[in-house]
């Protein structure tokens, strides 16, 4: 039996029905879902990218760097000349419909150590939307994450879609630029 001793003011309890509403958040100690093969993925669209290559790093700043499986490259929204602030978004075409349970977002590493996240620019708050046709979109999650090299986020309910869009609405240290080194789905 469950005994409810008290509830917070925003959690309604119906005395006539004897019903209580409980919200329980759980976590996984290890990810139980299989990674989705990214060999057929492509970047369908993006809000902005840095069009000029950084010396010695031809792909840094380009949107396709977010799915190139190379943690040393990254999608960086424009930082030379124009410096548009969030929201920044990237749309990925997985090539076919997939069952989605969550995502791993790898932020840009500090330039001097690959295990430490850059202090600013990595996603802090972002939305995930999915679509079957790249026209009608459904929001499947809004996430707030810490500044880690990798953040794993889980959807409340699985979703099936061909396309997904990640929209970063706030970055670490509230920087104008967004940096994502790698996006994986599971």
Describe each PLM feature range.
Residues 1-12, 84-88, 98, 109-186:
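Trp- and acidic/polar-enriched beta-sheet ligand-binding modules for extracellular glycan
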């Amino acid at each position: 039996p469950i005994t409810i001793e008290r509830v917070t003011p925003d959690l309604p309890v119906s005395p006539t029905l004897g019903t209580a509403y409980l919200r329980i958040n759980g976590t996984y100690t290890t990810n139980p879902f299989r990674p989705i093969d990214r060999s057929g993925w492509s970047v369908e669209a993006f809000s902005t990218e840095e069009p000029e290559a950084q010396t010695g790093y031809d792909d840094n700043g380009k949107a396709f760097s977010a799915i190139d499986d190379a943690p040393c490259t990254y999608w960086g929204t424009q930082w030379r000349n124009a410096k548009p602030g969030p929201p920044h978004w990237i749309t990925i075409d997985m090539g076919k419909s997939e069952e989605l349970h969550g995502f791993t977002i790898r932020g840009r590493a500090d330039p001097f150590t690959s295990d430490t996240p850059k202090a600013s620019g990595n996603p802090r708050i972002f939305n995930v939307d999915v679509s079957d046709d790249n026209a009608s979109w459904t929001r499947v999650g809004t996430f707030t994450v810490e500044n880690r090299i990798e953040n794993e986020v889980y959807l409340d309910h699985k979703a099936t879609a061909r396309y997904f869009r990640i929209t970063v609405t706030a970055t670490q240290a509230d920087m104008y630029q967004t940096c994502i080194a790698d996006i994986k789905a599971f």
